[in-house]
Amino acid sequence: MASSSSLVPDRLRLPLCFLGVFVCYFYYGILQEKITRGKYGEGAKQETFTFALTLVFIQCVINAVFAKILIQFFDTARVDRTRSWLYAACSISYLGAMVSSNSALQFVNYPTQVLGKSCKPIPVMLLGVTLLKKKYPLAKYLCVLLIVAGVALFMYKPKKVVGIEEHTVGYGELLLLLSLTLDGLTGVSQDHMRAHYQTGSNHMMLNINLWSTLLLGMGILFTGELWEFLSFAERYPAIIYNILLFGLTSALGQSFIFMTVVYFGPLTCSIITTTRKFFTILASVILFANPISPMQWVGTVLVFLGLGLDAKFGKGAKKTSH
């Protein structure tokens, strides 16, 4: 049968990818904050969700099952020749970025996490230039600098005498920095796959998530987090519904993410995932009353001004070697 992505006309593929990513991850972000920052129980016995590894494990299982279904029905003719070690390396950086990003939500609110992750095009670009010898036009670099300035304004916080709060904010930002670095390494791996093996989007999604499931499965068994999570879910069974919805929105969103990576490259994908985040921030502010200062709003405007200029003037990269 024909590949699922080949059923989409070329001129509609990029708008479809953007719309799919926007809709799926809009709801994904709301569910993520509801799960990780919600309070469970009543009175003095209230608990919080602290099982970041297990949450990503469930997410990867659902992603892998969804990708397998797509291959079974739409992509049976494609033969995947990508090396297993490349999938393994990509999954390590991929799940490392996801776990550190999810863990950061325990120390920073969702808008801060989202704006921090908006820097994703920077490591993807820099590592593409240094490791894959890509070249980008000057306008692209200027747009990225504008994004950096906006994010810096957003992340800046005047000193306060609050003790523990200062420590937790710093730790959350460190986790976001780690997540960004790993995002860049993931982008390099994916670019290598599409250039050398013409890896299909569904096969990429399936194998990266299978490796991630294996690694995370060992992690949650070794740390004992799985049993703690099961006990938590037994006390608060309502969370299971939200986690399953979270996994489903992740799987749908990832199918569009990998389609974008395969057809347009990791940098375009990172820019798409960033542009949709402004609306996610607005939803978080409205639904969860997360405060945003005037300086942070200026930073937000700069970030998305840079992205808008990039869409207009920043053309694709040229490869000098691969």
Swiss-Prot record:
InterPro entries: SCL35B1-4/HUT1. GO terms for biological process: UDP-galactose transmembrane transport. The keyword Coiled coil does not apply. Keywords: Antiport, Endoplasmic reticulum, Membrane, Phosphoprotein, Transmembrane, Transmembrane helix, Transport. A motif (Di-lysine motif) lies at residues 318-322. One of its GO terms (cellular component) is nucleoplasm. The chain crosses the membrane at residues 12-32, 51-71, 85-105, 136-156, 168-188, 210-230, 243-263, 285-305. The keyword Isomerase does not apply. Changing residue 120 to A: Loss of ATP:ADP antiporter activity. ATP:ADP antiporter that catalyzes the exchange of ATP and ADP across the endoplasmic reticulum (ER) membrane. Imports ATP from the cytosol to the ER lumen and exports ADP in the opposite direction. Regulates ER energy metabolism and protein biogenesis. Appears to be part of a calcium-dependent ER to cytosol low energy response axis, where calcium efflux from ER to the cytosol triggers ATP import into the ER lumen to maintain sufficient ATP supply. Provides ATP to ER chaperone HSPA5 that drives protein folding and trafficking in the ER. Belongs to the nucleotide-sugar transporter family. SLC35B subfamily. This is Solute carrier family 35 member B1. The gene is SLC35B1.
